[in-house]
Design a protein with these regions (language model features):
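Solvent-exposed beta-strand sheet faces enriched in polar/charged residues
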Residues: 7, 36, 69-71
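Compositionally biased, low-complexity segments enriched in small residues
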Residues: 3, 50-53, 74
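Compact, glycine-rich, soluble single-domain proteins
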Residues: 9-53, 57-60
Length: 91
């Protein structure tokens, strides 16, 4: 399992297009991806990173930190791709 924390840099956070891009990458990878928002140093309940609706329910805003768990074949590559999406400044 590959785990990492990353600060979301998109001006809209993980909403709409960034959430859709994150979920699409997670789904197409074939890996199990779990995503949590970090609040006061503690991760919230994890959601399915391959579900755009679940990702959006976290309410991740620009500057928030997220905790991501990726498990499965190709987890290193999937984790790297998800980190790029989270750190993108595009909305």
């Amino acid at each position: 399992m590959k785990e990492f924390k990353v600060k979301v840099l998109s001006p809209v956070g993980l909403h709409a297009r960034p959430a859709a891009a994150f979920a699409a990458q997670a789904k197409s990878s074939g890996c199990t991806v779990k995503l949590s928002k970090i609040v006061d140093g503690t991760a919230t309940s994890a959601v399915d990173g391959a579900s755009v609706l679940r990702v959006m329910t976290l309410g991740v805003k620009c500057g928030d930190e997220i905790y991501v768990q990726v498990e499965g074949e190709g987890e290193e590559q999937t984790a790297a791709a998800l980190q790029v999406i989270a750190e993108s400044t595009e909305d």
